Amino acid sequence: MAEMELATLICGEIAGTLRQDEHGLCSFAYAPTYRGAPLSLTMPLSNRTYGHNIVRPFLFGLLPDSQEQRRAIAAEYDVASNNPVALLCHIGLDCAGAVQFCRADQLDAARGRVSAYRPLTNSQIAHKLKAIRDDERETWMGSNESWSLGGNQGKFALAWHDGQWCECLGSSPTTHIFKNGVVGFKHQALNEFVCMKTARRVGIPTANVSYCTFEDEAALVVERYDRMVNSSGNIERLHQEDFCQALGVLPSQKYTADGGPTTRDIQERLINTVPHHMNLVLFTYMLFYNAIIGAPDAHAKNYSIILGKGTNAALAPMYDVASGLAYERMRRRARLAMSVGGENRVGRIGPGAIRRYHGMGDPALETALTDAGLSEKFCFATMMDLAYEVPICMEEVINEYADLPGMADLREHMLGPVCESCQRALDLIRADKG
């Protein structure tokens, strides 16, 4: 295997060097002068060289989970689909967060000195949406695009630039993600739109979403929270990572049932961040919200953290949230990707599970959580608040967007089951209180 060396930039600054040796093993070392945000919480700033087992999970987290998608990209560039360094050499100019990878001769491009936007018509966007529905491998990216998105769902990224949608060429940062839902689940993109809007209405920070139609193709359009427009009108990147990356776990193990991260793993990671109180509170709200609406895909890759210098970090807004209760087959055996206090059955999250979530039977963890403001009383109050508010807020969202195609059908199949789930949570807590 060919040796390879890629410059690694974070927020446009050279942060270090990613290397691959002749055996295919990768490593990363920070530049001696770099003082910015760490590449990952698993790789704090240091003069050491981080080895293959630490670096590899982070790199794979930047790539699509789907092996078919990775194979399609690999075939385009004639590299191996299981070689993240080789893939990022070609599509690493616009990754999740603020990290960029490039060869030394691409540094000008990576720093934005060689970039451009290509405007798209509604018809062209409709064609891209239709293509990922028919065969998501075909439209992972267009020619001359250099972005990469993690995850398993068909999607593509564009930029809103000068009042129009554009493809990004060179290192131009994308600003929005387009997806038309998980194949096989009716109105799934609309489902996600409603669940995201509901979460925001109950007070949980979420990525901005809109539901748009391009000719006859509907899409959920998600504004990237890891992008911001500065005072000069330029788009800046914010560095972030998901919790598989933050815990050094490969995306293939993102589900707890597959040996992936647990709520306790995330709690323990957040305790060591600043401000840990706010991060733990928000994570609890997000976890309980996913549980109460029966979201089956709220695994560790669907929680992320925005990184600052040192241990400064802020839990990222919610994203990729949709209820499984809208679908009869999932209602019958609904399971959560990440349990609450060891309980992953939707509708069974009762007082015992909530108490176990507060410490998981570990006195040291329980004390740390309580000291951080995450008391058992707070956990019960959070679940009850959500159980009261979610049915009201979800119905308000559905009514506000009643004219969207498919909304009446979604109301019929989702609102009732979600309300029932909320009522069961309240009943279990009330029964415990006597």
Where on the chain are the PLM-derived regions?
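Anionic ligand-binding catalytic core segments
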Residues: 1-300, 304-434
